[in-house]
């Protein structure tokens, strides 16, 4: 069951009860968005979420929605100081009736506290600055700067959430060495030898850019960059994902540089989960994607391929890290190569450059890996489900079957390739994509007489949980279909 921890109690999300409130808030948000009033838009969204999920909107919740925690960077060495600022997102229009305090804790990779500040009383909602010091003996890993807001004399916090940082031993030395080695002439000569080596090189360039950015800015992954009150909601769900595992993936970049510099192809025999990057055919930007290659990978064999499209707010990590691991698990067990695209951001909508990202990744993976082009499939969730329908039917000659989850298209999409095998999945209690729309889409497919059509509607299932529930069935469906 999905929910959130707020004021020390678990509040379940009841999508069926949310529907009227959700629709009303959506109408207000839409009107404010058209008016261009970002502050009122944010306040309305937060108030609506609080009323829907908590049944209340009081001063403490409003203060929690106004304050946010800011960190100066994402990546640090042992012994470094991490500046922390708690500041208001906008001004509170009337004097506060209550008194409030914030507390900052620093948690190690096992989420045990290393440091805990005193309660820092707020003067109105003026910014509070503090810092945490990373121990010199700290191991590499993911650490948390935890923030909590308290009403004076309360026994429990109003809200508690965190921002993550990564500690990497000898970070500055390693980045400097990689920057130097990546510019060596012998490495650059390798790039033009094959598409595989070129992909390894653009992957290195993207990783170096991310590590340099992480020195000077806090990098958020899917659903992580929201203000703390929203962040806490997403923490209790299943979609929050780091942009990358900085402490371990630095080794991947180092290995790629060493292999290329020694004349070896880093991707020729490598299996497992990899974060790769290529240059977009649209604007030459470096764009990441995730790729999973099954164990015992053998270039003399051909492999089926699934390309997955994330939903709104997600990124290339969503399918690989969320949904109870069912996406990679099926790929591993069945011997599939699977790719999860970035879509040019969390809200690209799989149109224009966002749609081209899907085709670029498909083309690239088919060039670099021995893919069975008669067994290439497309699937997606929510916004990615709509993208699956739109792109899949537009490029019907590229795919053997499609599987949109909690996303749909139009009868016009279906008419482009009515022979396309189509698996449609929907949760009955979906508050974001009403079940009626999925049923209507299924009926449109039936009206076309599509010869290979399967519809799954799970009772009592919401917008997110449906993905893991149907993943095995989708791969079963893919197993049955060739182009």
Name each model feature, range by range.
Residues 295-301, 349-383, 393-396:
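Gly/Ser-rich "nucleophile elbow"/oxyanion-hole loop immediately N-terminal to the catalytic nucleophile
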Residues 46-80, 87-91, 182:
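Short, compositionally biased P/S/T/A/G/V-rich stretches that sit at domain boundaries
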Residues 314, 319, 367, 374-418:
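Primarily recognizes the serine-hydrolase "nucleophile elbow" in alpha/beta-hydrolase
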Residues 93, 133-140, 294-298:
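Short, surface-exposed loop/turn segments at beta-strand-coil junctions that are enriched for proline
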Residues 158-303, 453:
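A domain-start/cap signature at the N-terminus of enzymes
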Residues 297-349, 431:
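Short substrate-entry loop that stabilizes the transition state in hydrolases
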Residues 418, 423-426, 430:
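Short beta-strand/loop motif that positions the catalytic acidic residue
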Residues 431, 435-483:
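C-terminal catalytic histidine-bearing segment of alpha/beta-hydrolase fold enzymes
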